[in-house]
């Protein structure tokens, strides 16, 4: 009974923490440097989750997914940093990027406390929720508020990768035992 309540609380907390478009019940207003910070932070957070999975999971599908997340998100980080440098755009910390980092610390603690199949389920459930939220934020907040055409184009190019990650995570989620 306790495990079910804990998992339910984790899922509810995770969903509410990553509901960035609902941030403070209104869409946050972000400058391009703040958008760059949110994009970098979101990718760094998912790399951190993937590294936990690579250390804790024994499931080949989870391990392969985590490897893909690390590779893809580190690639996006490198591209974002190169773009920021080319545009002379210094990412600026803001309420959204700070909230992402704070929420990630809580999620990492929760993931680190799990083992075996409970870990695999918690990790992949988090990945599904996280990617849904990040996609919604990129589509509903970051792209519409980007002033710089190259930054906007970069975000638009990253979107299909995020959607592929979501599809992959959803497929793995459907294959895990309930």
State each model region's role.
Residues 2-9, 18-178:
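His/Met- and acidic-residue-enriched segments that coordinate or traffic transition-metal cofactors
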Residues 12-14:
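Sec-dependent N-terminal signal peptides
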